[in-house]
């Protein structure tokens, strides 16, 4: 056992010396590796031939293995270290290359390639012309639609800006400077106010005449069919009269409140000019309505 331990220490020291020598002389390492490989092959062949003997004892085999294993153990680490050094030198010399990228071919290129391979016919020409015509028609229709939309938007803008343009011009032409002759302007304002009151009175009289005519016709119809009327019909008529009276009173209250609050200074809510025509429903009476 002591002999084997001493033998291993010698092997390790020889391996360190060989590695230092290999680092200093890399060219000699290559030749040493080749020699060690040839020696290992020859030793293996000798062992195989010696192992075929019949009168060989197990103790002799162990001693022979120990004696034969010493050169192999001496040479095997040298060969491994020399191969490692050669690999490291080769790896230092090699430069890292970028990874190749394979681009995918587009379907259009494949179609073009197939079309080039195929023979060209008159039908293909007709088909190409037809597709060109269809594309041209589509582009023309699209351009026409865009122009039409532009015209409609332009008309809408013009109509929005031109509403009540005449009324705006008349309002701008009015002389609202009261500092020149304040008394005269005040007198004109009273005249306009009286005209508005008379106009409102005429409208109310027309409504009153219409309601009186309706009541007169209703009274005549009641007198004609008085015998056929029942108690239930009379009650309905009375309730209807009460409702009409309530409606009339509520309308009078609204008119009074409107007359009282008509000329109060309030904050403007709608800046846009409305249609103040006589036939319109949203007709409002103001001091400029007489114009």
UniProtKB/Swiss-Prot annotation:
GO annotations of cellular component type: cytosol; nucleus; spliceosomal complex; U4/U6 x U5 tri-snRNP complex
User: Mainly localized where?
Assistant: nucleus
The record's subcellular location field reads: Nucleus
Q: Which GO terms describe its biological process?
A: generation of catalytic spliceosome for first transesterification step; mRNA splicing, via spliceosome
Q: Where is the composition biased (Polar residues)?
A: 28-41, 52-62
Composition bias of kind Acidic residues appears in 63-91
Q: Where is this region: Disordered?
A: 1-99, 239-266
Q: Which GO terms describe its molecular function?
A: RNA binding
> Which keywords describe this protein according to UniProt?
mRNA processing, mRNA splicing, Nucleus, Ribonucleoprotein, RNA-binding, Spliceosome
Query: Which residues does UniProt assign to the signal peptide?
Result: none
Tell me which domain of life the UniProt entry assigns to the organism this sequence originates from. Answer: Eukaryota
**Basic and acidic residues bias: start-end ranges:** 239-258
Provide the function of this protein: Component of the spliceosome and rRNA processing machinery. In association with the spliceosomal U4/U6.U5 tri-snRNP particle, required for splicing of pre-mRNA.
On subunit structure and binding partners, the annotation says: Component of the U4/U6-U5 tri-snRNP complex composed of the U4, U6 and U5 snRNAs and at least PRP3, PRP4, PRP6, PRP8, PRP18, PRP31, PRP38, SNU13, SNU23, SNU66, SNU114, SPP381, SMB1, SMD1, SMD2, SMD3, SMX2, SMX3, LSM2, LSM3, LSM4, LSM5, LSM6, LSM7, LSM8, BRR2 and DIB1. Interacts with PRP38.
Leftover remarks: Present with 2510 molecules/cell in log phase SD medium.
The entry sums up its family as follows:
Belongs to the SPP381 family.
* Name the record gives this protein: Pre-mRNA-splicing factor SPP381
């Amino acid at each position: 056992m002591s002999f084997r331990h001493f033998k291993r220490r010698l092997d390790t020291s020889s391996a360190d010396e060989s590695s230092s020598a290999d680092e200093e002389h890399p060219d000699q390492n290559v030749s040493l590796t080749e020699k060690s490989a040839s020696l290992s092959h020859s030793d293996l062949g000798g062992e195989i031939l010696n192992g075929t003997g019949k009168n060989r004892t197990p103790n002799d085999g162990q001693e022979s293995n120990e004696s034969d294993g010493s050169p192999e153990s001496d040479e095997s680490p040298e060969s491994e270290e020399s191969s490692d050094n050669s690999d490291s030198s080769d790896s230092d010399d090699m430069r890292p290359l970028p990874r190749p990228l394979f681009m995918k071919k587009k379907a259009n290129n494949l179609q073009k390639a197939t079309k080039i391979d195929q023979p060209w016919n008159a039908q293909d020409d007709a088909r190409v012309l037809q597709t060109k015509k269809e594309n041209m028609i589509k582009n023309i229709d699209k351009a026409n639609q865009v122009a039409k939309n532009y015209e409609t938007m332009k008309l809408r803008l013009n109509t929005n800006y031109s509403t009540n343009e005449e009324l705006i011009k008349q309002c701008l032409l009015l002389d609202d400077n009261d500092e020149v002759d304040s008394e005269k302007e005040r007198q004109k304002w009273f005249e306009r106010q009286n005209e508005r009151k008379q106009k409102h009175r005429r409208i109310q009289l027309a409504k009153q005449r219409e309601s009186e005519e309706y009541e007169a016709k209703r009274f005549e119809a009641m007198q004609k069919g008085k015998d056929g009327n029942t108690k239930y019909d009379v009650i309905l008529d009375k309730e209807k009269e009460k409702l009409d009276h309530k409606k009339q009173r509520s309308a009078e209250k609204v008119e009074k409140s409107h007359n009282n609050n008509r000329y109060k200074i309030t904050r403007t809510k709608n800046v846009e000019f409305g249609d103040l025509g006589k036939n319109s429903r949203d007709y409002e009476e103001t001091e400029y309505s007489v114009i």
